[in-house]
Amino acid sequence: MTICALVVLVYWLGFLVYPPLQHALLALPWWVQFVIANVVFDVGAYWGHRWAHSVPWLWRLHAVHHSSASLDWLAASRLHPLDQAFIRVCGILPVYLLGFSKETFGALIGLETVLAIFIHANVRWRFGWLEWLVATPAFHHWHHANEGPETANKNFSGLLPWVDWVFGTMYLPKRFPEKYGIDEPMPANYAGQLAQPFRSKK
């Protein structure tokens, strides 16, 4: 469902690609394109993710992902498809409209997918100064923490933690969180989770 929505969106918005800018980007070495594409994607996805926490109706979709009381790599796939589509479009659309090559686009999606699994993993590894450059389990576990106002709405980036630092939302103490999840009830089965955002609050 998410992929279909992205394909339709890309098809209809293709006319917005600006050829001179696209040609300038494609003239760059591939690795430079890849670095720029990662930054563009992560800034876009950062704001989509942040809006998913601050806009009430978006949070109702995103809460499905945050409902895991413990974190492991499978939590990366505990998603509402509409939430996933929204956040991914926020990251992918700017990359597409700038006209990056399909090879760069594919490599970016591959990295983002692998890293999403890794940062949700139930591991207690620390990586020193690298934790400021690339998202790690420690960084993302604090995004899922439920330990009070100090830890709320932090670490929205999925790739580059310094993006959170730039926008004032980075939080990375030396310890790992002890409590995860949300306070609101969430159905245990997938069908219930799909319907939950649309149920009226009592």
Give residue spans per PLM region.
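Membrane-embedded catalytic scaffold of the fatty acid hydroxylase/desaturase
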Residues: 1-9, 14-15, 22, 28-177
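A membrane-cytosol interface segment of integral membrane proteins
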Residues: 178-202
